[in-house]
Curated annotation (Swiss-Prot):
Subunit structure: Homodimer.
Gene Ontology biological process: prolyl-tRNA aminoacylation
A GO molecular-function annotation: aminoacyl-tRNA deacylase activity
Species per Swiss-Prot/TrEMBL record: Vibrio atlanticus (strain LGP32)
PANTHER family, per the entry: MITOCHONDRIAL RIBOSOME PROTEIN L39/PROLYL-TRNA LIGASE FAMILY MEMBER, PROLINE--TRNA LIGASE
SUPFAM superfamilies assigned to the protein according to its UniProt record, in alphabetical order: Class II aaRS ABD-related (SSF52954), Class II aaRS and biotin synthetases (SSF55681), YbaK/ProRS associated domain (SSF55826)
Coiled coil ranges: none
GO CC term (a single one): cytosol
Main localization of the protein described in the UniProt heading: cytoplasm
Protein name in the entry: Proline--tRNA ligase
EC number: 6.1.1.15
Length: 571
């Protein structure tokens, strides 16, 4: 490709609204342009990378035995009503009506559509197992699109759906897709980890996320220091403490704390150790309990894990905190003065809270706290659950080592759905005994456009992007110095360009009338792995200059061996 025929569109300055490095570099390298909030046009350079990700994913998913189809982006709303997800998805599900007032949605995912397809096309166990996938545009009406294509409203996604006659078959399909994901991300040159995950709105019995490790990641990943255990912090279990509850050493005392409305203020002003305090949070209860509000109690230095709380049957889903007005109407005090003593509401305590003694908590009166609280003596402990986020140094749930935390960007997710959708949509076949069997489903997604941004988060320097070879928009750049003034430079560049392209090597030939410095900066910014510089001075010595983008190394290469050198670098 000649730059004279190409839309390179690089920018010198970083746009003000670009927060993370991938967004900044995708704009500066001319990969994308913003059309509206969360909506982007993919320019030629970005599209070349996107297609490379798609092709690697397609090859590995094909190798796993899946079959490609293409489903509509526009879906009938009635399918979403069949599964009950029309409300569960909330405002992220963009709804509209056509000219005949028929309701539709823009596809955020395709479980309903593919299940509808299979129930009409498959009738016998002999047609199974079946795994169907597509690479298609998706739309989710994000409340706050940010980080460029990392969290956009419109995005490219590979979504696959497996159908099996039984759970054993589902597990085989699931493992095959897990392995295909690993092969795809390995080929892309990404540092990633598969981690245990919560199934969220998709549902099902088990799932794993695939995270590209990056400091800018929105998710925290918990790892064991001594095993392969890894889980999203939403899923990572905080084990019950092994120590016994210590005997009381203090009497419970009501203390005036007029200026302590937070745990931090309580600790600072009254000299308590933060691990000797608890915070009490009021949340909306589900229909499982008679009360409208239920209290959750966690240690003062721990954070409530909202996903764990939401998964408890007593808690309304989605999790909703009680307002200050609701709290005051119930106990007559504000959120900073709540505690378990004398509380006439059901409450659930975290495992770490259950072994505390001589601790401090709000007295359910503004400006007052109880110190020296002990379970049994001062307040009865009823229900205990895992409510908190794990922290570094916790024992690993696998029983080996301790927890370490790193940030990750979710680029893939696989689910064992079971019969959640097939049962709701009456998707069944005749089994070997002639009886009707509800199919077992799996679903699998890779955020193709998000992979592009994630790769940049892992592969960049102060000059621009340092693509892994498999994802680079071009393999080789040719930079001819002053070719419009030097005929022999032009001839050498044209000859090399013709030879490389004839070999199927992807080349960007910078034939612009630009200063060499501008050309070099653009090539570095875009991140082309291998550059050949052709100039009169080096040609006088019978050489071209080779530069490796990732290492920055430069070397003189004999003109008649440059192709062999490049072939070795690209091997």
């Amino acid at each position: 490709m000649r730059t004279s025929n190409y839309l390179l569109s690089t920018l010198k300055e970083t746009p003000n609204d670009a927060e993370v490095i991938s967004h900044q570099l995708m704009l500066r390298a001319g990969m994308i342009r913003k059309l509206a909030s969360g909506l982007y046009t993919w320019l030629p350079t970005g599209l070349r990378v996107l297609r490379k990700v798609e092709n690697i994913v397609r090859q590995e998913i094909d190798n796993a035995g899946a079959v490609e189809i293409l489903m509509p982006v526009v879906q009938p709303f009635e399918l979403w009503e069949e599964t009950g997800r029309s409300e569960k998805m909330g405002p992220e599900l963009l709804r509209f009506t056509d000219r005949h007032s028929r309701p539709f949605v823009l596809s955020p995912t395709a479980e309903e559509v593919v299940t509808s397809l299979v129930r009409n096309e498959i009738s016998s166990y002999k047609q199974l197992p079946l795994n169907l996938y597509q690479i298609q545009t998706k739309f989710r009406d994000e409340r706050r699109p940010r980080f460029g294509v990392m969290r956009a409203r419109e995005f490219s996604m590979m979504d696959a759906y497996s159908f099996d006659i039984d759970k054993e078959g589902l597990e085989k399909s699931y493992q095959a897709m897990h392995d295909a994901y690993c092969k795809a991300f390995d080929r892309m040159g990404l540092e990633y980890r598969p981690v245990l995950a919560d199934s969220g709105a998709i549902g099902g019995s088990g799932s794993q996320e695939f995270h590209v490790l990056a400091e800018s990641g929105e998710d925290l990943i918990a790892f064991s220091s001594e095993s392969d255990y890894a889980a999203n912090i939403e899923k990572a279990e905080a084990l019950a403490p092994t120590e016994e509850v210590a005997a009381p050493t203090q009497e419970m005392e009501l203390v005036d704390t007029p200026n302590a409305k937070t745990i931090a203020e309580l600790v600072e002003q009254h000299g308590l150790a933060i691990e000797k305090t608890v915070k009490t949070l009021f949340v909306k209860a589900s229909d499982e309990v008679e009360a409208d509000i239920i209290a959750l109690i966690v240690r003062g230095d721990h954070e409530l894990n909202e996903v764990k709380a939401e998964n408890l049957p007593q808690i309304a889903s989605p999790l909703e905190m009680a307002s200050e007005e609701e709290i005051r109407a119930l106990v007559g005090a504000g959120p900073g003065s709540l505690g378990p003593v004398g509380l006439e509401l059901p409450f659930i305590a975290d495992r770490s809270v259950a072994v505390m003694s001589d601790f401090g908590a709000g007295a359910n009166v503004d400006g007052k706290h109880y110190f020296g609280i002990n379970w049994g003596r001062d307040v009865e402990l009823a229900q205990v659950e895992d409510l908190r986020n794990v922290v570094e140094g916790d024992l690993s749930p696998c029983g080996q080592g301790t927890i370490q935390l790193k940030r990750g960007i979710e680029v893939g997710h696989i689910f064992q759905l079971g019969n959640t959708y097939s049962k709701a949509m009456n998707c069944n076949v005749l089994g070997p005994d002639g009886k009707s069997v509800i199919l077992e489903m799996g679903c699998y997604g890779i955020g193709v456009s998000r992979v592009v941004a994630s790769a940049i988060e892992q592969n960049h320097d102060k000059f621009g992007i340092t693509w892994p070879d498999a994802l680079a928009p071009f393999q080789v750049a040719i930079v001819p110095m002053n070719m419009h003034k030097s005929e022999r430079v032009k001839e050498a560049a044209e000859k090399l360009y013709a030879e490389l392209t004839a070999m199927g090597i992807e080349v960007l030939f910078d034939d612009r009338k630009e200063r060499p410095g501008v050309m070099f900066k653009d090539i570095e910014l875009v991140g082309i792995p291998h550059t050949i510089v052709i100039g009169d001075r080096s040609m006088d010595e019978g050489n071209f200059e080779y530069k490796n983008r990732r290492t920055g190394d430069k070397e003189a290469i004999a003109m008649d061996t440059v192709i062999e050198h490049l072939k070795a670098q690209l091997a």
